[in-house]
């Protein structure tokens, strides 16, 4: 369950409140006044715990759980013990997350590391920087020449914002983040160690060896984007590197120069996207996907973890494997290899 040492509930909710807030249907109204004060997994649930079950394969864990209420679908209702309030919904996990944001708002809204929203006298801020009145700049942060930072944004200790960069409203720039040659939209979160706008990997062979190609573009990060810890996004050579609105990028991802990522994409940890590749809106990349340079990935594409993408992918397709190919082809080839191995083993 939620650790109350770090996360304290912000308010008191009853089961009836939860049903009203989410639109879930409460099947047993006698539980209307039951108090919910924390969120839990089925296994760790205790007094006052709210849980969710979205798939039947996890429903057996309801038996013996100490939770007082559960979000579930209609097909799971018959598995719920009589001791629990039943909140029926087609989206259990989404409704569970909504209540989590209400009960524990501090868990999704980064707070100042030193507890106060202020501009620290120990921050290093260039006199030409333009800061909105309610910006928080913590001790040890560095704000360069002509930087602009919008209202409600928090720049944490040891973050560095390079000259001429723009940071929008309600952004969170975590410790050890560096931002240079970049325009950042509103409600953007950059988590610890993220590096935005550094040189792209541009080199060319010359008479004296390997020579640097100047990187003269920018990084543009649109509204609502989240960039995970230690992720790196290189600025463009001439064209901009762009991360589209609402996209979420996990930890330890490398995005090379000139890459264009569409709106509301999900990119899991340890992916590497080579230069000048474009990824369409609403596409998803599993962990450790590698994408070659100058590839065009369409909208609504799903790519399995560990895949190596060497060719363009049309809209709406699901690919996997290395080199990546459509799921059906990939599964057939894997099945064929297994069959060959089985035949050889039998012949021995």
Curated annotation (Swiss-Prot):
It is an enzyme of class 2 (transferase). Coiled coil: none annotated. Gene3D superfamilies: Hexapeptide repeat proteins (2.160.10.10), MurE/MurF, N-terminal domain (3.40.1390.10). GO terms for biological process: lipid A biosynthetic process. CDD domains: LbH_LpxD. It comes from the Bacteria. GO terms for molecular function: N-acyltransferase activity. Pathway: Bacterial outer membrane biogenesis; LPS lipid A biosynthesis. The active site is at residue 257. Pfam families: Hexapep, LpxD. The keyword Lipid biosynthesis applies. It catalyses: a UDP-3-O-[(3R)-3-hydroxyacyl]-alpha-D-glucosamine + a (3R)-hydroxyacyl-[ACP] = a UDP-2-N,3-O-bis[(3R)-3-hydroxyacyl]-alpha-D-glucosamine + holo-[ACP] + H(+). Keywords: Acyltransferase, Lipid A biosynthesis, Lipid biosynthesis, Lipid metabolism, Repeat, Transferase. One of its GO terms (cellular component) is membrane. InterPro entries: Hexapep, Hexapep_transf_CS, LpxD, Trimer_LpxA-like_sf, UDP_GlcNAc_AcTrfase_non-rep. Its EC number is 2.3.1.191. The keyword Transport does not apply. Homotrimer. Catalyzes the N-acylation of UDP-3-O-acylglucosamine using 3-hydroxyacyl-ACP as the acyl donor. Is involved in the biosynthesis of lipid A, a phosphorylated glycolipid that anchors the lipopolysaccharide to the outer membrane of the cell. HAMAP family: LpxD. Belongs to the transferase hexapeptide repeat family. LpxD subfamily. This is UDP-3-O-acylglucosamine N-acyltransferase. It comes from Bartonella henselae (strain ATCC 49882 / DSM 28221 / CCUG 30454 / Houston 1) (Rochalimaea henselae). The gene is lpxD.
